[in-house]
Amino acid sequence: MRRIAVMGAAGRMGKTLVEAVQLRSPLSGLTAAIVRPGSSLVGADAGELASLGRLGVPMSDSLEKVVDEFDVLIDFTLPEVMLKNLAFCRKAGKAMVIGTTGLGAREKQLLAEAGKEIPIVFAANFSVGVNLSLKLLDMAARVLGDDADIEIIEAHHRHKIDAPSGTALRMGEVIASALGRDLQQVAVYGREGHTGARERETIGFATVRGGDVVGDHTVLFATEGERLEITHKASSRMTFAKGAVRAALWLDGREAGLYDMQDVLDLR
């Protein structure tokens, strides 16, 4: 059995991850659940908090306290929290599955350095459908080339704090790479006022925030006479959680390295 720890186990995504781990039993089992230091939930049963019944896994407020109880840590927390956990797991030799978004160049460099010592799966989105979409986007960009104007539209719930979403940015990176472009040079984030005619090589991003939208992404390839749209809509966080657990199981026995869901799904 793969012993899995969930960071932020009291949050919305954390509870879903706890449930997803148990759904893969006996291949995986929740053996540690971590909440923020000082939380009133320390000692509470992780299964009961996730409405699964008692699992016998008490909430802890420290990785140090449960270091001998897990093989891989699943972490969807904020960047500053994830980086502390990364440093701990790197020192302790623990594998990680990371779904944190909003990372900058420095944070990604730290991930790359840690990947030289421990196995890590890092992805902006763990949905199987989204990762299949990335493969389709690469194909579409290569076929349509410079003939298409490309726009990426994403929508999420009102509580999401980063924009564009990590998934939208990853989609942009895949498309830009296929076209031999640098996303940082060609990305346009929103438009307002008298913008002038659209420059052919730009990749546009539009963001919508509202309600309880789990995550919608559409990429528009607009050419003269026709449009191609590739859309993915998530209706439940469970799709991300199941993908993360799949990644955790895939890491079993892997050598150190920085992997993503394209590796897990053999889509390279």
Curated annotation (Swiss-Prot):
Gene this chain is encoded by:
dapB
| Annotated protein name in UniProt | 4-hydroxy-tetrahydrodipicolinate reductase
What residues does NADP(+) bind to? 36
Catalytic-site annotation from UniProt = 156 (proton donor/acceptor), 160 (proton donor)
Q: What is the lineage of its organism?
A: Bacteria, Pseudomonadati, Pseudomonadota, Gammaproteobacteria, Pseudomonadales
The UniProt record gives the binding positions of NAD(+) as 8-13, 99-101, 123-126
EC numbers for this chain: 1.17.1.8
Which keywords annotate this record?
Answer: Amino-acid biosynthesis, Cytoplasm, Diaminopimelate biosynthesis, Lysine biosynthesis, NAD, NADP, Oxidoreductase
Function, as annotated: Catalyzes the conversion of 4-hydroxy-tetrahydrodipicolinate (HTPA) to tetrahydrodipicolinate.
Compartment list: Cytoplasm
Species of the source: Pseudomonas fluorescens (strain ATCC BAA-477 / NRRL B-23932 / Pf-5)
Q: Which residues bind (S)-2,3,4,5-tetrahydrodipicolinate?
A: 157, 166-167
Q: Which reaction does it catalyse?
A: (S)-2,3,4,5-tetrahydrodipicolinate + NAD(+) + H2O = (2S,4S)-4-hydroxy-2,3,4,5-tetrahydrodipicolinate + NADH + H(+); (S)-2,3,4,5-tetrahydrodipicolinate + NADP(+) + H2O = (2S,4S)-4-hydroxy-2,3,4,5-tetrahydrodipicolinate + NADPH + H(+)
Q: Which family does it belong to?
A: Belongs to the DapB family.
Q: What is its main location?
A: cytoplasm
* Superkingdom in the source lineage: Bacteria
Entries under NCBIfam families matching the protein: dapB
Q: Which GO terms describe its molecular function?
A: 4-hydroxy-tetrahydrodipicolinate reductase; NAD binding; NADP binding; oxidoreductase activity, acting on CH or CH2 groups, NAD or NADP as acceptor
The Gene Ontology biological process terms listed for this entry are: diaminopimelate biosynthetic process; lysine biosynthetic process via diaminopimelate
Q: Which Pfam families match?
A: DapB_C (PF05173), DapB_N (PF01113)
Instruction: List the pathway annotation.
Output: Amino-acid biosynthesis; L-lysine biosynthesis via DAP pathway; (S)-tetrahydrodipicolinate from L-aspartate: step 4/4
Q: Mind telling me which GO cellular component terms the entry cites?
A: cytosol
